UniProtKB/Swiss-Prot annotation:
Any one GO cellular component localisation term in the record: cytoplasm
Signal peptide, first to last residue: none
Name of the protein in its database record: HTH-type transcriptional activator RhaR
Site (Interaction with sigma-70): D245
Organism: Klebsiella pneumoniae subsp. pneumoniae (strain ATCC 700721 / MGH 78578)
GO biological process: positive regulation of DNA-templated transcription; rhamnose metabolic process
Length: 281
């Protein structure tokens, strides 16, 4: 059975249009698919499971993905997940601009799909996307040209403000919530103490907990546990490490407790997941 392929004609009104904006307010569960076009995915709020080329990512506010046409991905376990897809056809781009320099993986350049954006960059990107959406709706030559200019501006804005998911140093000028998300991503294998984090950053623990839940739809502990489970899934599928070693690498000192948590979240034991994921690959 052939996989689901999203076709250009379903999303681009004309054969000359290079860029379009696909809103997902909210993003529902979506089966695995590929595309005849590329896309940028920026998450505004809520949470969900994004599986990209068989690798699971627990996504929430500020997550940014660069998706190539051949990449297969899906969305599951969504909870008020709000995101925008900026879709584009590389072969239709006319503007003399270094697209490959700004967009990882384009035209065979090194591909790193997953990044994060802080509040400052997200606010700037939102303004550009709003203008881009307006121009795409015009459906004329001037609108197409303006849309391409704005897409170049967006690509540069994302390039300027994106940072590695586990790089807390990159968030020093960002809001406290952005710093927290980066600190959590850098704590997959070691304990994270919110009280200590708030002391270091001079923030209110109670206020930060409330803000985190409001923006992501999860508690801080739940989000960190989901990050660790996703990382464990990846290691189980792609390495030969013992389950006990993987448990330690994912922040679980007790392998039995790891197995209990993993089974509760995934619906099968770590060993069963390893066997099933490899059989499906």
């Amino acid at each position: 059975m052939a996989g689901l392929i999203l076709r250009k004609e379903e999303f681009f009104p004309s054969a000359t249009q290079a860029v379009a904006v696909a809103d997902r307010y909210p993003q529902n569960v979506f089966a695995e698919h590929t595309h005849e076009f590329c896309e940028l995915v920026l998450v505004w709020r809520g949470n969900g499971l994004h599986v990209l080329n068989d690798r699971p990512w627990r996504i929430t506010r500020g997550d940014l993905f660069y998706i190539r046409a051949e990449d297969k991905h899906s969305y599951a376990s969504v909870n008020d997940l709000v995101l925008q897809n900026i879709i584009y056809c590389p072969e239709r781009l006319q503007l003399n601009f270094d697209w490959a320099g700004a967009i990882p993986g384009l035209f065979g350049t090194p591909w790193k799909p997953h990044w994060r954006m802080g509040s400052t960059g997200m606010a700037q990107a939102r303004q550009v996307i709003s203008q881009l959406e307006h121009e795409c709706a015009r459906r004329d030559a001037q609108g197409n040209a303006m849309a391409e200019l704005l897409f170049a501006q967006l690509a540069l804005t994302l390039q300027r403000h994106r940072y590695a998911t586990d790089d807390p140093a990159a968030t020093q000028r960002e809001a406290l919530l952005d710093k927290l998300l980066a600190a959590l991503a850098a704590s997959l294998s070691r304990p994270f103490v919110l009280e200590r984090f708030c002391e270091q950053e001079g923030g209110s623990e109670r206020a930060l907990r409330q803000q985190f839940r409001q923006q992501t739809g999860m508690t801080i502990n739940h989000y960190l546990r989901q990050l660790r489970i996703c990382h464990a899934q990846y290691l189980l599928q792609h390495t030969e490490r013992l389950i006990g070693d993987i448990a330690m690498q994912c922040g679980f000192e007790d392998s039995n407790y790891f197995s209990v948590v993993f089974s509760r979240e995934i619906g099968m034991s770590p060993g069963q997941w390893r066997q099933r994921s490899r059989a499906a690959a």
